[in-house]
Amino acid sequence: MNSIQLIIDIILILWLLILTVLYLRKKSLNLNIVKNKKIVRAKRYIVFYVIAESKVKGDDLERVVRNSLKDLLGNVWLNIANPKVVTYREDTQEGIISTNRIGYKAVLASLPFAKEINGNKILIVPRRTTGSLKKAKKLIGLK
């Protein structure tokens, strides 16, 4: 009886040892992927225009976009996506929101929830998502 228990214990210890080695190998492979700066820096630029009753300022617009994302998905997704209004043309009511590759869909989903700025009803309409700032600026007529 003791010899059978000893064999079972040895098999379990070997099994746990094998699982630990496989887990540590997988973890070290994932760390190498995260260190790739091209993946970390991947940006997305959302080209949008604003339909509003009166003119809207860029600073107010960024605050409303961040608040709508926070209301929809919470602080965690706000920190992940980190949306910023890079460029905003007040004359044509067009602009560019910068975000990362992970959070751009969350930002797109939260744009309809931005409904009001300083008592002024607004609607933010995304036109296109691009991977380069140069192309985004070209879409709104800059450079």
From Swiss-Prot:
Its EC number is 3.1.26.5. Its main location: cytoplasm. The keyword Hydrolase applies. InterPro entries: Pop5/Rpp14/Rnp2-like (IPR002759), Rnp2-like_sf (IPR038085). It is found in: Cytoplasm. It is an enzyme of class 3 (hydrolase). Keywords: Cytoplasm, Endonuclease, Hydrolase, Nuclease, tRNA processing. The keyword Cytoplasm applies. One of its GO terms (molecular function) is ribonuclease P activity. GO terms for cellular component: cytoplasm; ribonuclease P complex. GO terms for biological process: tRNA 5'-leader removal. Transmembrane segments: none annotated. Consists of a catalytic RNA component and at least 4-5 protein subunits. Belongs to the eukaryotic/archaeal RNase P protein component 2 family. Part of ribonuclease P, a protein complex that generates mature tRNA molecules by cleaving their 5'-ends. This is Ribonuclease P protein component 2. The gene is rnp2.
